[in-house]
Amino acid sequence: MSSLQKILDIQYVKMENEHIADILEIERDSYGYPWSEKIFLDCITHNYHCKVLLLDEILVGYVITSLVQNECHIMNLCIKKNYRSHGYGKYLLNELHKEITNFNCKLVFLECRPSNKSALSLYKKEGYNEVGIRKNYYPAPSGYEDALILAKNVKE
């Protein structure tokens, strides 16, 4: 990504209210059961760790995390469809990992649908391991889908 960074203006910045319209577009285009505008605004208002990835001023991704003591829970991470499989998800994760180690976070965990093969592939390449399952966690057209719980140590 560093060679891309020299050519393109890539920014990892704090999520602001003015980003919400673009985030909602990505969210609705990516998920059958998207988060609402209120959820995103509540995350910003209640000091969740909310970041966006801008590429030449275009919002291409975002991540929302909860930081509690020495743990980081990734609650939502998404890359705009046309920008997937180009390294932006990896870049976003790596920036998050670097940043949270400054807050003494040692463990990062998240939930992922087993059906989200591309996300699972990214997380596993980035050192996440499956540590559990949450039964019937995600709404799905046929009822509910389990969630895989993935975790990574970012600081020993």
Residue ranges and their predicted role:
Residues K90:
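Residues forming the Rossmann-fold NAD(P)(H) cofactor-binding site
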Residues T65, E130-V131:
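Short beta-strand "wing" residues that participate in macromolecule-binding interfaces
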Residues E57, G87, N116:
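Conserved G/P- and acidic residue-centered "switch" motifs that form tight phosphate/ATP-binding loops
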Residues I7, R113-N116, N136-E156:
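C-terminal "cap" of GNAT-fold acetyltransferases
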Residues I100-E111, L122:
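Conserved GNAT acetyl-CoA-binding A-motif
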Residues L4-I7, Q11-R84, L93-E95, E99, ...:
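Acetyl-CoA-dependent GNAT
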Residues Y123, Y128, L150:
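Conserved active-site tyrosine of GNAT-family acetyltransferases
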Residues I58-G61, S118, Y144:
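Glycine-rich acetyl-CoA-binding "A-motif" of GNAT/NAT acetyltransferases
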